[in-house]
Amino acid sequence: MATGANATPLDFPSKKRKRSRWNQDTMEQKTVIPGMPTVIPPGLTREQERAYIVQLQIEDLTRKLRTGDLGIPPNPEDRSPSPEPIYNSEGKRLNTREFRTRKKLEEERHNLITEMVALNPDFKPPADYKPPATRVSDKVMIPQDEYPEINFVGLLIGPRGNTLKNIEKECNAKIMIRGKGSVKEGKVGRKDGQMLPGEDEPLHALVTANTMENVKKAVEQIRNILKQGIETPEDQNDLRKMQLRELARLNGTLREDDNRILRPWQSSETRSITNTTVCTKCGGAGHIASDCKFQRPGDPQSAQDKARMDKEYLSLMAELGEAPVPASVGSTSGPATTPLASAPRPAAPANNPPPPSLMSTTQSRPPWMNSGPSESRPYHGMHGGGPGGPGGGPHSFPHPLPSLTGGHGGHPMQHNPNGPPPPWMQPPPPPMNQGPHPPGHHGPPPMDQYLGSTPVGSGVYRLHQGKGMMPPPPMGMMPPPPPPPSGQPPPPPSGPLPPWQQQQQQPPPPPPPSSSMASSTPLPWQQNTTTTTTSAGTGSIPPWQQQQAAAAASPGAPQMQGNPTMVPLPPGVQPPLPPGAPPPPPPPPPGSAGMMYAPPPPPPPPMDPSNFVTMMGMGVAGMPPFGMPPAPPPPPPQN
């Protein structure tokens, strides 16, 4: 350094300029902040003084960041040396001086705001304040290679990612699963073909948060899930069950009662009052005995039921004249009711007899009186070949003949003395208190029952007796049904023999004496028995006239009640003959045996088919009932 005269002006330091209020280069300037008091009041505490200073600094930094006055010296020589430049993919520098200065001011303001919030919880940061982007992160390794059978990723993510979202929400952290196996096979990676971040690392969970406390909390929950998946079996893992339940709820297949009740095969059947109701007839459940429609299957019939059915069957066969009357019927069935005194029955359609149950229970009418008119059944009295004749066996029906001739070609309606009497001459079944029929009996009830609604003592009955004519049978009268066919199996051996076998085994009885008619008054169905048996061999009077004479000769016989529905025939009117029948023979000459009766009246006028009442025999007197054969003509005179 030169001294003295050799000294230059540069060697002497420059004098400092005097400071003045108008100088613009002063380093210290007064700071004026709007809204902040410039005078500090006395008596403040240390916390209040610190809060005032911190708030003043926050406002100053906010003003600088807002106005862009970052305090960078304009002279480059006064600036501090810059670090190495950092460029982005576009070639722009990232760490410029302005960027570094702004980042420094933001960090300083962030620290001041954090301190101010701790001093004054009611402090509100500036509007342009944003927390810094720096975050705390941590990694949690997932032992997938050690336990390949456990799905750790599924336990962490959960159904639709809800488990991971819940952890992030609770811990205020961000969790990402990265590494090998974090991405499912087949998913497309980055478009540029580069690897995803952390893909070359082992499988792990990256936890990122603003604070270290949030990161630690999230890491602890992740480790608990991994530990539970390793130590607890899958069927006992509560987290796994909860995830499956939530997945079912999201899919709409959740049943809320699965865990509260047992399975159908494990729970007992609920008791119902209907299931406990048992029928006493059929043994079924669900209904009572009064509503049961079936009998108990397989129950054997009692002895009383069998005896009652046998008795009803024997009674029916006795009414048909095919079996003896059981001895107990008269005492158990109450007062006997004759068919003539029974109640009227409405007309039934053709070929439709009543059911056997009605015949067996009522026992009021024989079946040939209850059956309707039928053209398919022949009449015994209208053709030859009856029982015992040339027609066949004792129970075979002969073929109908076109003319009203006997079985041997004799006179019309002449009885064969060698064979059994015609059906209208056969005796009726004996009364219920007189035992069975005599052997060889084959016929139906006597003609007194065929009178139907005509009483014995009525005028119509006497009219027919006086004129030598048989009264017409009532409506609904039909001959007895034929016996069973030969192909029908016989009844079981335990029951009684069939009626036709009983009749074949019994020998013919001797004819009853004629004196029995005079000793006591016979019953109505016994009046024809004596007359028909005694007159069978004489041949002086025709059989149908013998019955009428015998009925007229017994005035003491009780009169039978007629059917109230039948209209009696007026005197002097003869029933019309059926179509196809031969005309009646002329009356016998005087002095013959047939002149004891009045000659028959002329036939009535023809019927009007258009009048239904006339056709039914209810409007014109003297017309026979519907579907009944007419009375036979009187016999020719005998020389």
UniProtKB/Swiss-Prot annotation:
CDD domains tied to this protein: KH-I_SF1
Motif interval(s): Nuclear localization signal: 15-19
Residue numbers carrying N-acetylalanine: A2
Residue positions, PTM Phosphoserine: S14, S20, S80, S82, S89
ZnF (CCHC-type) residues: 277-296
Biased composition regions of type Gly residues, renumbered to the chain: 382-394
Cellular localization per UniProt: Nucleus
Tissue: Detected in lung, ovary, adrenal gland, colon, kidney, muscle, pancreas, thyroid, placenta, brain, liver and heart.
A GO biological process held by the record: spliceosomal complex assembly
Biased composition (Pro residues): 418-447, 470-499, 567-591, 598-608, 626-639
Keywords for this protein: Acetylation, Metal-binding, Methylation, mRNA processing, mRNA splicing, Nucleus, Phosphoprotein, Repressor, RNA-binding, Spliceosome, Transcription, Transcription regulation, Zinc, Zinc-finger
Record GO terms (molecular function): identical protein binding; mRNA binding; RNA binding; transcription corepressor activity; zinc ion binding
Primary location: nucleus
Free-text function comment from the UniProt entry: Necessary for the ATP-dependent first step of spliceosome assembly. Binds to the intron branch point sequence (BPS) 5'-UACUAAC-3' of the pre-mRNA. May act as transcription repressor.
Family matches, as PANTHER family: RNA-BINDING PROTEIN RELATED, SPLICING FACTOR 1
Subunit comment: Binds U2AF2. Interacts with U1 snRNA. Binds EWSR1, FUS and TAF15. Interacts with RBM17.
UniProt record similarity statement: Belongs to the BBP/SF1 family.
Name this polypeptide is given: Splicing factor 1
Organism of derivation: Homo sapiens
Lineage of producing organism: Eukaryota, Metazoa, Chordata, Craniata, Vertebrata
